[in-house]
Amino acid sequence: MKKLMACSALTLSMVASSLAFSADTPAATTIRTLSGAQPTQSLSANATALLVIDYQNEYFIGKMPIPDGVKALKNTQRLVSFAHQHKMPVFFVRHLGPANGPLFAEGSKFADFHPDLQPSGSDRVITKATPSSFVGTDLDRQLKQAGIKQLVISGLMTHMCVSSTARDAVPLGYTVIIPEDATATRDLATWDNQIVDHAVLQRAALAGVADVFAEIKTTDQVLALPVN
């Protein structure tokens, strides 16, 4: 009986210690928050640009279909209209692979922009060959020449080209907003023959880039921002 009581007391003590430790553990936060970053309250029409990344047929009728691609495309259409309305520059980014390559083959229909999201005459087109929209392109030069300080980044895929572009943008001096529902990704195979669901990967990718590099909003929240 004494042994049972001693065991119970030890168990209760361990539980109490665990609860005390949990209470003392800081709530999860981001490096941006710890660094004092504040939510964006408005957009400057002269200093903000919209990047529209890789809305190409490969992700819709090709080898890498994106489950939520159409939803993201429709929200990006709204962002493009918003940018045009406020005379913000819009940059359409496309990925091109070798003409005989397996993905985004140059000259193929899979490398073409989706028919429902095409650049207009006033939009600029950037062609890249890596996940980042900055590597091997003159995007940074064009943005700086236009006086751009802030980027709204939409596109495919969230964990790859959207994230890579955001991560490269910040060291170049830009602030970044990612409208989360204007981006999307696909199910991903892992090294141990498992599958990471696209919704799980989407959330993890956004959380990863939001820690340091980007402010995450919805499309509705971006469209509701005052423009000056």
Label the model's feature ranges:
Residues 64-83:
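…and closely analogous acidic/polar surface helices at protein-protein or active-site interfaces
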Residues 8-17:
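Bacterial N-terminal signal peptides
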Residues 58-61:
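Short acidic, Gly/Ser-rich segments with clustered Asp/Glu that frequently serve as metal-coordination loops
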Residues 1-8:
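Bacterial N-terminal signal peptides that target proteins for export
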Residues 92-93, 155:
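Surface-exposed patches in mature extracellular/periplasmic domains of secreted proteins
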Residues 21-49, 77-81, 86, 98, ...:
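Active-site-adjacent betaalpha module
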